[in-house]
């Protein structure tokens, strides 16, 4: 979600446990390069004014944390209603079930996307795009069953790049990967 927010000049917020509507608004205000005000209504008005002037996509990561706080979810709906800015919710596998409790909100979703495990071709594309060290197809095929979550993959790429630089590796072959993993 953070990567998408950066790519599309959006607003990225990571929801936190016990996050209130006030806290959420303060975070959005900060993302809009404003100083949060004392009154919640002032913060809401700043968000609306700034987003009407310069519309941006809002990405809310870990939306699961907000599912038990009706007012916070309604605040997001109000922001969308007033600004018409798209809001992307990113959550765990059962978040759509939790969101169904908010019928008037759930009906507004244009699309619900469930991310499945990466295929070998997907993994190769990720490694080709993010790693400075090339990987053979065979090495990617070996990695595939063991590392299939994006965060895991990013951590693995980082660790393998450090190892490659420390050990003069210019390309990861199956034999090398097999010895490391």
Regions found by a protein language model. Name each.
Residues 79-103:
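Sensor-1/coupling segment of RecA-like P-loop NTPase cores
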Residues 48-72, 86, 91:
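Conserved P-loop NTPase "ATPase switch" module shared by AAA+ and STAND
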Residues 9-10, 101-117:
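A short helix-turn-beta junction within AAA+ P-loop NTPase domains corresponding to the substrate/partner-engaging
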Residues 9-11, 21-38:
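Conserved NTP-binding/hydrolysis module of P-loop NTPases
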Residues 17-20, 65, 93-97, 118-123:
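Conserved nucleotide-binding/hydrolysis micro-motifs of P-loop NTPases
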Residues 30-54, 66:
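Central P-loop NTPase core of STAND/AAA+ ATPases
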Residues 2, 104, 116, 121, ...:
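C-terminal alpha-helical "lid" subdomain
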Residues 1-10:
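P-loop NTPase Walker A phosphate-binding motif
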């Amino acid at each position: 979600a953070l990567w998408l927010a950066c790519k599309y000049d959006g607003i990225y917020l990571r929801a936190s446990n016990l996050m209130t509507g006030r806290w959420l608004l303060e975070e959005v205000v900060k993302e809009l390069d404003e100083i949060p005000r004392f009154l919640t209504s002032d913060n809401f008005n700043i968000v609306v004014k700034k987003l009407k002037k310069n519309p941006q996509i809002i990405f809310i990561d870990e939306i699961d944390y907000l599912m038990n706080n009706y007012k916070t979810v309604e605040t997001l709906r109000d922001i969308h209603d007033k600004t018409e800015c798209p809001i992307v919710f990113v959550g765990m596998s059962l978040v759509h079930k939790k969101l169904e409790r908010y019928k008037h909100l759930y009906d507004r979703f244009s699309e619900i996307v469930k991310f499945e495990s990466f295929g070998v071709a997907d993994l190769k594309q990720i490694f080709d795009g993010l790693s400075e060290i090339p990987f053979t197809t065979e090495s990617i095929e070996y990695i595939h069953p063991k590392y299939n979550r994006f965060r895991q993959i990013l951590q693995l790429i980082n660790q393998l790049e450090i190892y490659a630089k420390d050990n003069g590796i210019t390309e990861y072959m199956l034999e090398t990967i097999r010895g490391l993993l």
